[in-house]
């Protein structure tokens, strides 16, 4: 879903329970994605540059901390200034240093990150500190015109 948002794509995810994704879907709609929910699928379409927003991770049914890096990538490409507040885990922002190597403009203070959206990323060699960060950096790589290598 976030790959579609980052690349201005059109993706349908099958075999999901859309109700379980309410917080994630709500944020995708908030930033400007078109989202269609089906019985066991979700379609995400992003045609234009997306908008900034505020995200705060919370226990289910709130916004999932596991999806925080993925929306961070999308917000780094969105128009305007976004804020992510991580209220579940410490040190969940390690991927942002790597995203900055690709051209993202980010300031981290404690458990909050302020992200100023840029038009596009530049390809770079980046290192994923964990699985979630690796997924996010792969999405960032899809959104570049250059070559991105994720170690």
Q: What feature does the model see in each segment?
A:
Residues 1-151:
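Short, structured segments at the rim of ligand-binding sites
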């Amino acid at each position: 879903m976030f790959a579609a948002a980052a690349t201005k794509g059109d993706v349908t995810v099958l075999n999901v329970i859309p109700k379980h994704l309410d917080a994630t879907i709500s944020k995708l709609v908030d930033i400007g994605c078109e989202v269609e929910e089906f019985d066991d699928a979700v379609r995400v379409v992003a045609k234009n540059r997306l908008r900034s927003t505020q995200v705060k991770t919370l226990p289910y049914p709130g916004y999932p901390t596991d999806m925080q890096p993925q929306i961070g990538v999308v917000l780094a490409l969105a128009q305007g200034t976004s804020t992510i507040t991580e209220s579940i885990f410490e040190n969940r922002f390690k991927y942002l240093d790597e995203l900055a190597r690709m051209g993202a403009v980010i300031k981290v203070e404690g458990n909050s990150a302020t992200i100023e959206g840029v038009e596009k990323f530049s390809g770079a060699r980046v290192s994923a500190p964990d699985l979630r960060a690796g997924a996010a950096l792969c999405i960032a790589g899809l959104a570049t015109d250059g070559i991105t290598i994720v170690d």
